[in-house]
């Protein structure tokens, strides 16, 4: 069971493959950044619909289990309804390890990368490389090629050019 307020464990969890509609939501999110390189996902339904990347051989084993797991594979995000009542896939950072990223990303130098992983925003001068094609959200890489987070670009503000939305240091700051 996860710790925190994210999931209430009341009621029955349901484990199933993603539907074609849910896969389209996942695919559309990936296409904002490049090409999805993984095709098999499962859903664990409770209060939320958590999305996990699994392979088919693992899925075949899960289908045979008498008890269904509350998680399996790699957790890559959640499908939920947003404030405008639109169903949307909200990826986490691990999701992007399944995407061949070709657009909407920024590369930061060592100091800016460190500061980003401590929750700080990024000034324009700290961006070593930017491939931005109009998406509000962009992926953030360090200069070693590691994905370190997700940010929101603000082209009108040079001091807070990229707002930190989510980073790999988040877990350690809890």
Swiss-Prot record:
InterPro entries xrefs: NIP7_N (IPR040598), PUA_sf (IPR036974), UPF0113_PUA (IPR005155)
Transmembrane segments: none
Gene3D superfamilies: 3.10.450.220, PUA domain
Pfam family, one: UPF0113
Sample GO molecular function, one term: RNA binding
Highest taxon, organism lineage: Archaea
Family: Belongs to the UPF0113 family.
Name by which UniProt lists this protein: UPF0113 protein PH0281
Organism of derivation: Pyrococcus horikoshii (strain ATCC 700860 / DSM 12428 / JCM 9974 / NBRC 100139 / OT-3)
Organism taxonomic ancestry: Archaea, Methanobacteriati, Methanobacteriota, Thermococci, Thermococcales
